[in-house]
């Protein structure tokens, strides 16, 4: 579809990339985001926050974000990766404007955007994305061992005794 840019700062500072939105879109990605897997119709901050006690359905932003998504509709699939670490906003159909056809946009705090567009099946798009940004190396075996975190341990009565008993059980199970 047609693309448009905020070159004259009509919509404020930073850069904005608009794309025509199809009504049957399913959108997947963006990293650590709450809610359903299909992100169509939502708006997200592209930023990080320490969101302890978050609501898994609605809290945004969370700990990690990736300004990359895959869009699937009746025409096919494409992926877009915005190559930036700057804070931003991704609107995937939340905003509706009576004077414009359906659209989605990515707005970045940077004055220019660098982005990559991938075409193919969802698997092919993910493979292209991984070749572009690099793959995560396989972590060492020990990193798959048992791990837990909670603030409750520090305030529990006899916390050291409870932790020692817990660790003994974990060792007995070879975790």
Model feature map: region roles:
Residues 1-143, 147-154, 159-161, 167-172:
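Catalytic and substrate-binding clefts that recognize carbohydrates or anionic sugar/phosphate headgroups
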């Amino acid at each position: 579809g047609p693309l448009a840019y905020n070159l004259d700062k009509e919509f404020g500072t930073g850069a904005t990339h608009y794309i025509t939105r199809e009504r049957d879109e399913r959108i997947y990605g963006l990293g650590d985001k709450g809610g359903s897997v299909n992100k169509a119709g939502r708006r997200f901050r592209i930023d990080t926050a320490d969101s302890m006690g978050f609501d898994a359905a609605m809290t945004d932003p969370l700990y990690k974000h990736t300004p990359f998504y895959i869009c699937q509709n009746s025409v096919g699939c494409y992926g877009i990766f915005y190559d930036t670490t700057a804070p931003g906003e991704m609107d995937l159909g939340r905003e509706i404007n009576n004077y414009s056809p359906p659209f989605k946009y990515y707005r970045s705090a940077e004055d220019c955007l660098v982005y990559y567009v991938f075409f193919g099946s969802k698997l092919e798009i993910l493979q292209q994305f991984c070749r572009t940004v690099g793959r995560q190396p396989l972590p060492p075996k020990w990193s798959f061992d048992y791990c837990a975190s909670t603030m409750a341990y520090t305030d529990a009565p006899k916390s050291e005794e409870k932790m020692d008993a817990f660790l003994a059980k974990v060792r007995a199970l070879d975790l």
